[in-house]
């Protein structure tokens, strides 16, 4: 047990980002309620970041804040804000203003080549294996590794992995790969019929899955800024 009353540690969490393309509070509220109704177990009372970059000239923050709060979503921060007046208004509401990370400038090349590190022997990545059906209401999490399910996943079940997710059976529940922020994570399944699929926080609800892949063997991964899907051969 630590001798200090608190301890600060760095960590990372995956949050959904609500990108506003309309500044009308009622339109925003209705659109969010429609999305929440499609995946209530995943989205109801979920923490979110609100990006206002596309609409900040038109934003009346108090009304938008109330509209989003009325849906049950919890605003953890606002990004994409550059107008000083609006920044002040959001800050006074007690909501953090977030700055999206920028790419670091490349370091100058060293004058002498650095010798490569010695090879690591017997480096093993753990994998969590589930042989039983995953039933509605069950949640399975595979921290720091891949998750393999060799059976069916029912509607209402949830699979979460920091690495890849493989489902060799009917996938009807929710699959969240790259939960720790790994954008290279992927989802593989032999029968794609999921309520929700997510990689590093980028997600599709069932109605976003292209019809030609629904119920088929599929592989999902992140493109530059959105999920992509292709046949699993």
From Swiss-Prot:
Ranges where the record places region Disordered: 98-123
**Residue ranges, compositional bias (Pro residues):** 107-120
Task: Could you list this entry's UniProt keywords, alphabetically sorted.
Answer: Cell cycle, Cell division, Septation
Q: Which residues are in coiled coils? A: none
Alphabetical GO biological process terms: cell morphogenesis; division septum assembly; regulation of cell division; regulation of cell septum assembly
InterPro entries attached here? Answer: CAP/MinC_C, MinC, MinC_C_sf, MinC_N, Septum_form_inhib_MinC_C
Gene3D superfamilies for the chain: 2.160.20.70, 3.30.70.260
UniProt family annotation: Belongs to the MinC family.
Q: How does it assemble?
A: Interacts with MinD and FtsZ.
Function in brief:
Cell division inhibitor that blocks the formation of polar Z ring septums. Rapidly oscillates between the poles of the cell to destabilize FtsZ filaments that have formed before they mature into polar Z rings. Prevents FtsZ polymerization.
Q: List the protein's name.
A: Probable septum site-determining protein MinC
Source species: Klebsiella pneumoniae (strain 342)
């Amino acid at each position: 047990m630590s001798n200090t009353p608190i301890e600060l540690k760095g960590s990372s969490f995956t949050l959904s980002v609500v990108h506003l393309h309309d500044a009308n509070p009622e339109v925003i509220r209705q659109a969010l309620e429609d999305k929440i109704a499609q995946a209530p177990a995943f989205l109801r009372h979920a923490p979110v970041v609100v990006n206002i970059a596309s609409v900040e000239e038109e934003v009346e923050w108090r009304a938008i804040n109330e509209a989003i709060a009325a849906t049950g979503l919890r605003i953890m921060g606002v990004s994409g804000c550059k107008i000083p007046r609006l920044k002040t208004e959001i800050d006074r509401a007690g909501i953090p203003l977030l700055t999206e990370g920028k790419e670091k400038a490349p370091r100058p090349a060293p004058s002498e080549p650095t010798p490569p590190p010695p090879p690591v022997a017997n480096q093993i990545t753990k994998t969590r294996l589930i042989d039983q059906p995953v039933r509605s209401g069950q949640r399975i999490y595979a921290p720091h590794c891949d998750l393999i399910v060799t059976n069916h996943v029912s509607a209402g079940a949830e699979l979460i992995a920091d690495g890849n997710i493989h489902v060799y059976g009917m996938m009807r529940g929710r699959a969240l790969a790259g939960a720790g922020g790994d954008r290279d994570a992927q989802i593989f399944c032999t029968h794609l019929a999921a309520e929700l699929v997510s990689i590093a926080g980028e997600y599709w609800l069932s109605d976003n899955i292209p019809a030609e892949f629904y119920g088929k063997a599929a592989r999902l991964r992140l493109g530059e800024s959105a999920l992509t899907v292709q046949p699993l051969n």
